[in-house]
Amino acid sequence: MDPLTLEYLQEQYIKIQLLKKSEKSEVWLVYDTDGNLAVMKTIYNTGLPIKLLKDNPSRFWPKIHLLHEDKDQKYTLVIEEFIQGKTLEAFINDRKITPSKGVTLFKEFCRGLKDLHALGIIHRDIKPSNIVIKEDGSPVLVDFDSARLASSDRGKTSDTVLLGTKGYAPPEQFGYATTDVRSDIYALGVTFDKVLPADSPFMLKKIVRKCRAFDPDNRYQNADEILRALSYARLIKILGGLLLLAIPALLLIKFVLFPMSAKPTEEQKHEQKYSTQQNEEKVQPAAKESGPTKEEKNQTSAETTHSTQQDEKKS
């Protein structure tokens, strides 16, 4: 028997549990010859960019142990790392993702997607059930059955094969135009719209909404743009928090340097009124001493007139 036939390769592993079976593939949890857990995938398709994943290992996708492609029989056999953890879908259903953890996952996933797109690969089936959260909290993207190399000829051709999952796949993935990295951006937005809580900050909602734009030109053009937008949103949040802290501090400084005069009590008002009356009484005598009164002026005038008359008689 040819050592590279599908049957021979499959016999090198002990099947434990069927994980998934469809028209596109069959996936088994297996033991290898050393007794280690692994995932065996028989994909009824060829030309997938899985060799690029094998040659460029990353924590964002499973490590590929073995890859065999038979173009005549039109199948690809993949033995890959078994990822210990729970799917993002399970976390969403259990409602065990806090808002801060959701944002952290969003950022980490964008970093991983940036690495994937740097290889020229688009996944085309990003959804919560295809994201496994490891025990250390990091996300891993699985199921590359629909993956392909991104086309550099944007918008001039359309995908002839309808792939992906309804509700997560963008419009262009259903024959409107060719798919590219922005198609993964769309699915990413739909996914994390389900992860992040409804009361998330406005700027975070705005980022997710832009990811999901109908027109690819209106979306973020790559994962790096999303990371910059998330960093900006965090900066605005920090500055807003500092402003809220600064307002009470500024008010305190104002009251210390420029204290407001207290409203006088009734007793203080009475004392102030009494003091004013006393001052008025002191001013009145002083006014009398300052010059002759009207009666004194009249008497002086009369004496002056009488004296003048006496002088005239003598003369």
Q: What are these model-derived regions, one by one?
A:
Residues 219:
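Conserved HRD-motif arginine in the catalytic loop of eukaryotic-like protein kinases
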Residues 113, 117-133:
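Catalytic-loop of the protein kinase fold
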Residues 157-172:
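Conserved activation segment of eukaryotic-like protein kinases, specifically the C-terminal portion
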